[in-house]
Amino acid sequence: ALWKNMLSGIGKLAGQAALGAVKTLV
């Protein structure tokens, strides 16, 4: 279950980073 929590955490960070990049580009 630990790896699932890690993946979910990484996914959230990646999502925030992607949104930040999109906002910067736009």
Swiss-Prot record:
The keyword Acyltransferase does not apply. Has antimicrobial activity. It comes from Phasmahyla jandaia. Keywords: Amidation, Amphibian defense peptide, Antibiotic, Antimicrobial, Secreted. This is Dermaseptin-J3. The lineage of its organism: Eukaryota, Metazoa, Chordata, Craniata, Vertebrata. Expressed by the skin glands. GO terms for cellular component: extracellular region. One of its GO terms (biological process) is defense response to bacterium. Belongs to the frog skin active peptide (FSAP) family. Dermaseptin subfamily. It comes from the Eukaryota. InterPro entries: Dermaseptin_dom. Coiled coil: none annotated. The modification Valine amide is found at V26. It is found in: Secreted.
